[in-house]
Amino acid sequence: MPELPEVEITRRGIDTHLAGRVITQISIRNPVLRWPISAGLIALLPGQRINAIARRAKYLLFACSRGTLIMHLGMSGNLRVLPESTPPQLHDHFDLQVDNGMMLRFRDPRRFGAILWWDGDIRQHPLLQKLGPEPLSDDFDGQFLYTKTRGRNASIKEVLMNQHIVVGIGNIYANEALFQAGISPLAAAGSLNTMQCERLVDAVKATLLRAIKAGGSSLRDFTDCEGSPGYFQQQYWVYGRAGQSCRQCGELVSKTRQGQRSTFFCARCQH
């Protein structure tokens, strides 16, 4: 699943091509995603200008003349900017054409993504209004994490992936950040002290920024809007490296399951 770095890479690429452009045509080939794509978008969107493209958590927000188009990549979604004459392929479900002869194409083999319209205050959308802070913002700091973890018996990894506490951190980057912080993913969140929380917040921010700089992680489906893969997977400390030597101490990387997700860690480096 694309996590925050991959969605941010997508946003930056799309913004270069689409911000300020006027939508000319909408094509819906398969409306069946996580929620059905409204056929009303075919008449509603043409003529509207895309004023800005923002990101909230893993949602892409296209601020248009009369509302906001919301996109989520789901498990396998991908957005490409292509010439409008490019023939569609299997799993290409939605096209948004603009006034420079280009289009935004939404491809989603597993169809867990979403394309929604909201004409009110975007902060009040039901999918967005209860989200936690952005992990790269000043609102997410050591004191915030320390406060949010008090009395929690859930593992710190599960808390990091709770979108009501902090957004955008998926399985890959939770594993990597916990290794960088030297904290076991199995530790109860409420057991962390203030110093550990500060160290973990710093590791989360550093890991996400490094991933964005590397173009994100391309393990299965992800490419940026021009079709280029990311390379952060080449820098993984523990994720996907079970049974291999820890790059820091030589101990074999361990693997377990937490909440239906694979967890990777070094028992020597992480406590």
Swiss-Prot record:
What does the record's cofactor remark say about binding? Answer: Binds 1 zinc ion per subunit.
Q: Which InterPro entries match?
A: DNA_glyclase/AP_lyase_DNA-bd, DNA_glyclase_Znf_dom_DNA_BS, Formamido-pyr_DNA_Glyclase, FPG_cat, MutM-like_N-ter, Ribosomal_uS13-like_H2TH, Znf_DNA_glyclase/AP_lyase, Znf_FPG/IleRS
Record's keyword annotation contains Lyase: yes
Question: Does the keyword Membrane feature in the UniProt annotation?
Answer: no
Zinc finger (FPG-type) boundaries: 237-271
Name of one Pfam family that matches: H2TH
The EC number of this protein is 3.2.2.23, 4.2.99.18
Q: What is the superkingdom listed in this entry's lineage? A: Bacteria
Q: Which cofactor does it need?
A: Zn(2+)
Active site residues according to the UniProt entry: P2, E3, K58, R261
- Choose any GO biological process term that the UniProt entry carries and state it: base-excision repair
Instruction: Name the PANTHER family on file.
Output: FORMAMIDOPYRIMIDINE-DNA GLYCOSYLASE (PTHR22993:SF9)
Annotated protein name in UniProt: Formamidopyrimidine-DNA glycosylase
Give the organism, scientific name.
Answer: Nitrosomonas europaea (strain ATCC 19718 / CIP 103999 / KCTC 2705 / NBRC 14298)
Q: Which gene encodes it?
A: mutM
